[in-house]
């Protein structure tokens, strides 16, 4: 479903799986802190993050960078960061945490391909993992959580505790006036929270835009 949805497959947004996703987001919108939409922009987003630090919101979707991003922000007494994967939709199902990998490429016409392959293999060595960890980057190596420190131990150990990694993104498409992934899928959630848009209006907009996205895939 994930791959089909992110490639705008015809009819995908009218499936039971898609409806479940829409219903979950709409339900979350019902008890999202009402001040969130006004601060959901590139200038004020840290104020929404501050709601968690102040114990005014119990959770938020975010990334491991949040600790550094809010390092100097005030917080409630005894506050500690926590993290969990997205809960399974059904009991006994899989839970997921979204992630992505940086990529290294070797051009097919490269002169020193063997040396390049050796270097890429080095990127996953114990020594390289130590270097990456000092910069706050984590290599996709089994057991890496055992070598981490501080909050990163908790963040990345969720995969060792059974969470699966969800990877991928919306497929790119040729520019379409007035249509972007963010404005179609994500920004309307602010209107769900404020009550200015219904769940069905959101769905209808996604279906309409996806038809155009699919027709303009790169």
What spans do the regions from the language model cover?
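Extracytoplasmic/periplasmic substrate-recognition and gating elements
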Residues: 30-33, 72-138, 187
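Glycine-centered hinge/linker elements that transmit conformational signals in sensory
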Residues: 7-40, 86
